[in-house]
Amino acid sequence: MAKDTTGRLHVQVKTGGKRKLSSKLWLERQLNDPYVAKAKAAGYRSRAAFKLLEIDDKFRLLKHGMAVVDLGAAPGGWSQIAAKRVGSVDGKGKVVAIDLLEMPEIAGVEFAQLDFMDNDAPAKLTAMLGGGADVVMSDMAANTTGHRKTDQLRIVGLIETAAAFACDVLKPGGTFLAKTFQSGADADLLAQLKRDFATVRHVKPAASRQDSSERYVLATGFRGGAKA
């Protein structure tokens, strides 16, 4: 172990055998990330839970009794926070988590293993909720290729699809929150969100790694409304 510039102990992982440098760096980052340790101690499935906690503490998106949709939910960190904040753990609000991957059960969360891009996904979702959603949120990230321009377009395309889904299921006044990355490729996305929502802003919670271009687009005051 070594100490970093703050005086904290820093775990170093040796490269050996078949371990690649990229794997070594990822493992070191995980071992030295305070949010990873905090998530484990709090029983959260991922460090991403703290990102939603920080955003919600500031903007008060999740209120008791709300209906929430978590797109690309696995492993479930955001769904855990939403269930507590809207009261679905106590049967008051409702949280539906959607993912292509299987996800272990979470108290107060209804899970649907499906592709939200399917044409019938909005109808299935509103049937599960018994109506429209108050919040649609997504911490998804597109698979990357290593080619910067291609990756930027993939990321923006995924968010655009998530936003279109949100517009199909949100109630009037609803909220859309999604992960994005700082680039010049999202001008059309932001323009569309500004047409559909009263307020659109970017936020970067402290739990987002500071050396990452990751940030979140937060759109509030949906101007439309889910079809009955």
From Swiss-Prot:
Its EC number is 2.1.1.166. GO terms for molecular function: rRNA (uridine-2'-O-)-methyltransferase activity. Its main location: cytoplasm. S-adenosyl-L-methionine binds at G76, W78, D99, D115, D139. The active site is at K179. Pfam families: FtsJ. Keywords: Cytoplasm, Methyltransferase, rRNA processing, S-adenosyl-L-methionine, Transferase. It catalyses: uridine(2552) in 23S rRNA + S-adenosyl-L-methionine = 2'-O-methyluridine(2552) in 23S rRNA + S-adenosyl-L-homocysteine + H(+). GO terms for cellular component: cytoplasm. InterPro entries: RNA_methyltr_RlmE, RNA_MeTrfase_FtsJ_dom, rRNA-MeTfrase_E, SAM-dependent_MTases_sf. It is found in: Cytoplasm. Specifically methylates the uridine in position 2552 of 23S rRNA at the 2'-O position of the ribose in the fully assembled 50S ribosomal subunit. This is Ribosomal RNA large subunit methyltransferase E.
